[in-house]
Amino acid sequence: MPLNKSNEVFITCAVTGSGDAHNKSPHVPRSPKEIAKSAIEAAKAGAAIVHCHVRDPESGEPSRRPDLYKEVTERIRDSETDVIINLTAGMGGDVFFGSSESPLPLKDETDVAGASDRMQHVKECLPEICTLDCGSMNFGDTDYVMANTPSTLRKMAEIASALDVRIEIEAFDTGHLWFAKRLFEDGIIKPPILIQLCMGIPWGAPDDLNTLMAMINNIPKDWVFSTFSIGKNQMPYVAAAILSGGNVRVGLEDNIYLKRGVLATNAQLVEQAVKIVESMGSKILGPKEVRE
């Protein structure tokens, strides 16, 4: 496939995530105040979109408490920083099996909720965007399964559409993209369609360029896509996204290092992405332009 370089690119910053990065870097925000502050700094560095999870302020463990999301969104809005808020709706589909020999009982970390409960914070905060993880997968080398059934995803998409909240499809593998196209064909999600290709996360789609292009070649031409990879491949994927006609995601959810041995802030990761985008001759879009 010939190169289809993006001449205009928007940057998403994934601010904190739900993994254990908070135990590895002091820069990973935990409290709503810290998450909002980091999101604002990322926006000022050049991110048009901030993708936010929340954490328990004391333990740093992932949470889906609506009051925490409410505080994050209110703090960002009260700062009068122009940025598009994108809230995760991925929480509530987490199944942790006991072990390979004794899968039951499930571990205490298991958190499985219905579609309405998983969307409660979206109802209360009304972000411009919320995510929809369009499938299930074995997540990493543990007994954790990210579980998202078709009926649950359809209901969540219907709730978001009724709230006039734009859905960002998260596709971790080809089957997720296939299901997203079915949601579109069934009229459950409306254009314009925004999709994030989540690459290199075990055990979804690997982040080699052949697999990336296979995913991209299966995206309808009028859909808007971003893509990212994790860890040391985060910044190389900024260039890959631009060269393949897509948009960019960076942030501490996916990578905690600025370079080998140097822990990053979200703003620093965005600044580094900005340098790559501009060095490749592309224009960085602001939130107003992205909305249009």
Each predicted region: which residue ranges?
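Active-site beta->alpha loop and helix N-cap motifs at the rims of alpha/beta catalytic domains
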Residues: 32, 69-146
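Histidine-centered catalytic micro-motifs
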Residues: 13, 32-37, 47-59, 84-89
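Glycine-rich, proline-tolerant flexible connector loops at the mouths of alpha/beta enzymes
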Residues: 23, 48-72, 141, 198-199, ...
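N-terminal small/glycine-rich loop or linker at the start of catalytic domains
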Residues: 2-27, 92-93, 97-102, 131-139
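Mid-to-C-terminal alpha-helical segments outside catalytic/metal-binding sites
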Residues: 275-292
